[in-house]
Swiss-Prot record:
The gene is rplE. It comes from Teredinibacter turnerae (strain ATCC 39867 / T7901). This is Large ribosomal subunit protein uL5. InterPro entries: Ribosomal_uL5 (IPR002132), Ribosomal_uL5_bac-type (IPR020930), Ribosomal_uL5_C (IPR031309), Ribosomal_uL5_CS (IPR020929), Ribosomal_uL5_dom_sf (IPR022803), Ribosomal_uL5_N (IPR031310). This is one of the proteins that bind and probably mediate the attachment of the 5S RNA into the large ribosomal subunit, where it forms part of the central protuberance. In the 70S ribosome it contacts protein S13 of the 30S subunit (bridge B1b), connecting the 2 subunits; this bridge is implicated in subunit movement. Contacts the P site tRNA; the 5S rRNA and some of its associated proteins might help stabilize positioning of ribosome-bound tRNAs. The keyword Glycoprotein does not apply. The lineage of its organism: Bacteria, Pseudomonadati, Pseudomonadota, Gammaproteobacteria, Cellvibrionales. GO terms for molecular function: rRNA binding; structural constituent of ribosome; tRNA binding.
Amino acid sequence: MARLKEKYLNEIAPKLKEELGVANVMEIPRITKITLNMGVGEAIGDKKVLENAVADLEKIAGQKPVITKARKSIAGFKVREGWPVGCKVTLRRERMYEFLDRLVSIAIPRVRDFRGISPKQFDGRGNFSMGVNEQIIFPEIEYDKVDKLRGLDICISTTARTNEEGRALLKAFSFPFKG
């Protein structure tokens, strides 16, 4: 069992139940999935760029990403409908907890000039989204083999109903929030 899943079941869930004052165990907020998305606009001109992005995301997530295609043609961006424009991967269960562990304990501390995560990154329903500017903060990516620094979006979906519940959940997982 993943270290953070064990911590959630044994420590975080009972603490949140008491803190939030919920009667039913199923009402305790929990993380349902983590989605990693890498938009690669340069993939239009060069297919090799997308292959490198897919390889990087596969190393970071530990599973094969799916290639996302453009939904609409946009002349300003020189994009046609159906062209590959990025890749994404959805993590659930064990892999999700293992990624979360690496994110909180290894990757976030390696971010340059890091001053904490803004609490404004919640969507109003307890889900949390953050952007990472460089994929090299993850230990799986070797700096010498990176062709270009790419960022990625990390979206953490929870069963929390409000931002406060979501923040309490992620704070219990030792997310470094500001203030």
